[in-house]
Amino acid sequence: DKVGKQARVLEDIGYDGLKSIETAHDPFMPLLVASQNTEKAELITGIAVAFARSPMIMANLGHDLNAAAKGRHVLGLGSQIRPHIQKRFSMPWSAPAARMREFILALRAIWANWYDDQPLEFLGKYYTHTLMTPFFAPTNNEYGAPKVHLAAVGPLMTEVAGEVADGLLVHGFTTEAYLRNVTLPALDRGLAHSGRTRADVEVSYPVFSIKGRDEKEIAAASKAMREQVAFYGSTPAYRPVLESIGVGEVQGELNALSKQGRWEAMGDVITADVLD
């Protein structure tokens, strides 16, 4: 009930998109509730962990939510990182960019079977889908497939977004320098692979921000932001983002603190210059 009320309020005050993340809870359930309490806002998973599920399961989830939302669902996917996929989800990890490309192509093949009566003959390196009988194929196909947006930080995954996705979800942990020098050129390379331009994709960039009504709130928000930046900065895959502003060396320090479980101490490593 709380989710439904909040969704209505956000739509009423002008938000045209509502996003649900996959952290402590499934990202689809809140959006299902929101779909029954809103009329216009896009409902976006931001993100759903692709490699924690098979393409068939994800195809079903995307279809069902898009049908419930009457065509307003955007299936935002992300890879997560190796430790979470292997140790938290107990799923295989390899060549994430290549695997994600195949994952999205598998989704397209499954949906083509459901919506366009195309034979399901997807034979890939990582995923194989060759069986679909009428009993298991959805029939409520009025709204078709959701748009697929892909979260990416590294250049290879960003190229995949440009090649096969409908949109790119830029990570909030992205500097202006990294966006201009790494992300957008990689997106353009991916678009070139598929003969598309930037006009053919949507790009979402949820920047980190610090705000408050007084100095006390600003101080609290700054502390929380330092801890959030430190959390992401501890991940080796995100070191190039820190290097883009000349502070790549702090990644090793943050990683060491994270392995010691010193999460709050990590925030002290992030200076005001880094936040700026």
Model features per residue range: what roles?
Residues 20-23, 47, 54, 96, ...:
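Glycine- and other small-residue-rich loops at beta-strand/loop junctions that grip anionic moieties
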Residues 1-45, 51, 146:
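N-terminal beta1-alpha1-beta2 module of alpha/beta enzyme domains
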Residues 1, 48-55, 142-153, 209-213, ...:
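Active-site mouth loops of central-metabolism enzymes
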Residues 55-63, 212-222:
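Catalytic cores of alpha/beta
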Residues 20-29, 51-56, 175-179, 210-212:
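Acidic-and-aromatic substrate-binding clefts and catalytic sites of carbohydrate-active enzymes
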Residues 81, 174, 205-213, 249:
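Glycine-rich beta-alpha junction loops
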Residues 217-275:
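Active-site pocket-lining/capping segments in soluble small-molecule metabolic enzymes
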Residues 59-63, 67-167, 172-201, 252-254, ...:
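Internal, glycine-rich beta/alpha segment that forms the wall or movable "lid"
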